[in-house]
């Protein structure tokens, strides 16, 4: 029992550390899985023959042309940007070369992230990557296209689009589909209500992509839209665009965890000090130290005898009127 009592503070501190670094560890694991998904995607694309590659790309462009003819964009896609799984078989088959729903990936240098892009915006998709909003253009470039990509913000398990609000006009992001990479430069940042989908409309002749996340942080009553227009792509532009791992602990986890750990450490140190003080007192008594002879092992004075009782006892022994007989 005593051993358990000594180990308990250490276990609690370790538990607090795990809670403290849970967001960072979880984000690291998700980013590692995202990196694997990107590498697997690139390998699958490389395995395509030229004929297969062209067939997949042509089908995506044909889909976009049909959307443009139907004036797509003014839809309820933005309002259903969360928990919306696609049931359209044609849509789900496009750009889906591995059958896992991944159509490509996006790299945002400002956020230091490279994330897979999946069909639809179901909760399962948004927990691990970026979702493409159905009824918006597929992100394969071209005139009169407007793709919309949605990502979660503020998840305790992953960053994703948590820092999308840091994007400024002029920032760039890159979308890789099959063997092609498309560069976009931010030109418009707006905040709208979930039902306001006008900002997603296709604009004739323009090649646009809008990144979407919830706002304000942890309130999520509105949508933050970061729009970019197509610019020429040069490979060296993406040199600083690789994702990096860094410690990122939200304050709502950091401050309480640090306070708890500090209290537990202080309590453990006090317990150790008290234990040593008692052991020191016991050692002095056992060694016959005259300075500690009257000190109990726990540091307290021993109980003193009652002087009244002592005197009464002495009087009874002598007895009243009795004298000591001379030798």
Task: Identify the residue ranges that each predicted region occupies.
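C-terminal accessory segment of soluble enzyme catalytic cores
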Residues: 1-2, 322
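Solvent-exposed, non-transmembrane regions of membrane-associated and secreted proteins
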Residues: 2-250
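Compositionally biased, intrinsically disordered low-complexity regions enriched in proline and serine
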Residues: 23, 42, 54, 254, ...
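C-terminal single-pass membrane-anchor helix
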Residues: 240-291
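Cytoplasmic C-terminal tails of single-pass
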Residues: 276-327
């Amino acid at each position: 029992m005593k051993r358990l009592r000594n180990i308990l503070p250490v276990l609690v501190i370790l538990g607090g550390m795990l809670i403290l670094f849970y967001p960072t560890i979880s984000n690291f694991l998700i980013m590692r899985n995202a990196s694997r998904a990107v590498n697997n995607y690139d390998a699958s694309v490389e395995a395509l023959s030229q004929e297969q590659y062209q067939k997949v790309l042509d089908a995506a462009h044909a889909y976009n042309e049909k959307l443009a003819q139907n004036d797509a964009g003014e839809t309820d896609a933005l309002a259903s940007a969360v928990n919306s799984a696609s049931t359209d078989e044609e849509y789900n088959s496009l750009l889906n070369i591995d059958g896992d729903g991944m159509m490509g990936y996006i790299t945002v240098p400002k956020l230091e992230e490279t994330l897979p892009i999946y069909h639809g915006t179901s909760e399962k998709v948004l927990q691990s990557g970026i979702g493409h909003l159905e009824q918006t253009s597929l992100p394969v470039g071209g005139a009169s296209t407007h793709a919309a990509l949605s990502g979660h913000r503020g998840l305790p398990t992953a960053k994703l689009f948590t820092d999308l609000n840091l994007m400024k006009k002029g920032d760039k992001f890159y979308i890789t589909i099959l063997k092609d990479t498309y560069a976009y430069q931010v030109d418009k940042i707006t905040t709208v209500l979930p039902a306001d989908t006008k900002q997603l409309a296709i604009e004739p002749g323009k090649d646009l992509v809008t990144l979407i996340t919830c706002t304000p942080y942890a309130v999520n009553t509105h949508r933050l839209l970061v729009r970019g227009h197509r610019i020429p792509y040069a490979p060296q532009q993406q040199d600083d665009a690789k994702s990096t791992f860094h410690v990122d602990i939200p304050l709502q986890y950091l401050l309480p965890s640090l306070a708890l750990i500090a209290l537990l450490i202080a309590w453990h140190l006090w317990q150790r000090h008290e234990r040593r003080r008692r052991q020191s007192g016991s050692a002095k008594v056992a060694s016959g130290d005259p300075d500690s002879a009257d000190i109990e092992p726990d540091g307290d004075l021993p109980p003193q005898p009652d002087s009244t009782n002592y005197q009464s006892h002495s009087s009874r022994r002598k007895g009243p009127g009795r004298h000591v007989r001379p030798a």
